[in-house]
Amino acid sequence: MTNSIEQAWDLAKQRFAAVGVDVDAALTRLDTLPVSMHCWQGDDVTGFEDPDGVLTGGIQATGNYPGKARNATELRSDLELALALIPGPKRLNLHAIYLESDTPVARNKIEPRHFSHWVTWAKKHQLGLDFNPSCFSHPLSADGFTLSHADPEIRQFWIEHCQASRRVSAYFGEQLGTPSVMNIWIPDGMKDTPIDRLAPRQRLLSALDEVISEKLNPAHHIDAVESKLFGIGAESYTVGSNEFYMGYAASRQTALCLDAGHFHPTEVISDKISSAMLYVPRLLLHVSRPVRWDSDHVVLLDDETQAIASEIIRHNLFDRVHIGLDFFDASINRIAAWVIGTRNMKKALLRALLEPTDMLRQLELRGDYTARLALLEEQKSLPWQAIWEGYCQRNDVPVDARWLDAVREYEQQILSQR
């Protein structure tokens, strides 16, 4: 460490020790908590299946910042820069539309070999991979239905796509030695008030059971399902609601995905974690930032991001919660978006680990809510930034906004040529 950072580090450790926090133990734990970065920030959820295709499914990537990745080589290059600017363990989350093939591949025919380059790259960079079937931006999803479609042939197509995706996910886990979390999200819903809310959900229930019927090694693959309140063009009814997937995950013992933007604007997923964990074996979190709707803005170090991290740490959910990011902002430098959002998630986890939780819990159990509030607020002023800077320097990444210099240089030399 440099002298100034080392001095600040030593003083900060003393401050935290005075309130019973072991900084070294906190950093050891932080190094066991990977954050899964989402590949689709790098190209506005375009993928490689049809680069000229239109994004559908009730989601939008707004903006037209130059330099988005146009192929796998460019996307991996951009990711490598982002990864080099973020301390600690990371993973990469892929969608099925990021396959690589010299010839067109139907989505229900994808195979592990179409993702072999990603596995080779992940091994080189010591990353785990996660996966998602892509049930959007496709002719057979154009009318707004996939796994709950009333047409059995179309429904079967999407069932087969999800089944094939599970095999890809298991391949990732087997090759990389860490389980791949495969999340199923579908856009199915209606713009206006439906007459029959039940039948699509019955079809979805049956379809999901068929999707997960093949037994896969849990050391390689974990199933997750994700709800949503509404999407553009599906404002009145969403088949895969929170109640539907909470019941499904609890009854089938899959993981449940909670996306920060997939609920009513006054709801927060930090308040849902402790309840859900009583009924499901695992949670997948999609940390995002909804602005008035599921806008998928870049994650900030705000109250909700901190609350999400605190719930994980306070309840020792390290082995049951998988932390992923889900945002896509096309109005700013896409590499910077990755770095900002992922560093903020890491900062939130660090701050949660540096909290004197045992002391605060004892005050709560004694009913001393005055002291609980006072100390909870005072601990926010403890010098966690000095620990963060030391952690960054230990991991050979920039300690402050100097990481932006590397992004700007890359933008001038590489992105400007696209």
UniProtKB/Swiss-Prot annotation:
Its EC number is 5.3.1.14. GO terms for biological process: L-lyxose metabolic process; rhamnose catabolic process. Coiled coil: none annotated. GO terms for cellular component: cytoplasm. Mn(2+) binds at H262, D294, D296. It catalyses: L-rhamnopyranose = L-rhamnulose. GO terms for molecular function: L-rhamnose isomerase activity; manganese ion binding. Its cofactor is Mn(2+). It is found in: Cytoplasm. Pathway: Carbohydrate degradation; L-rhamnose degradation; glycerone phosphate from L-rhamnose: step 1/3. Belongs to the rhamnose isomerase family. Homotetramer. PANTHER family: L-RHAMNOSE ISOMERASE (PTHR30268:SF0). This is L-rhamnose isomerase.
